[in-house]
Amino acid sequence: RSSDLFVADGGTAANYKGAIGVEGDEVKGCDIVAPRLSFGWTVYKPKEIITVAYVKSLASMVGRTNASAFLSFAAGELLFVGASGSRRAKQDDWELTFKFDASPNVSDITIGDITGISKLGFDYLWVAYEADEDDDAKIVKPQPRQVNVERVYRSADFSPLSINA
């Protein structure tokens, strides 16, 4: 992230410390594409494994993140978004495709003067601001007061998926 600041001759640029779209005491922010990858992993399972209990187990993992390392992704980096499948009559088994979103865990984030922030891939980070007087620029501007990292997805053990990578 970087900023270029431009002011009129004789003016002094305000340091918003990473806040974007500042209007008065409000920070509007901006929409960006978050690092995220969607992928499917196809496996073949014997017909005896695909039971109602197995399907219910899959359903219980939808919308959960990985509680431990899985498919070489660290805990918190995978979100299980579902599965689809069909029976293959000739092979007498099931073809299942597990669907995931991946987003990297991030550490050493700095927002304003707040350092040492870290978040898991699917955590939601938001910032609370307070008014700060900038004597040089002669304005009152928002200053990051607190960074909040919210765990919006529960985690689950993905080992019952029995994916061999």
What are these regions (language model features)?
Residues 1-165:
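Compositionally biased, intrinsically disordered low-complexity segments enriched in polar/Pro/Gly
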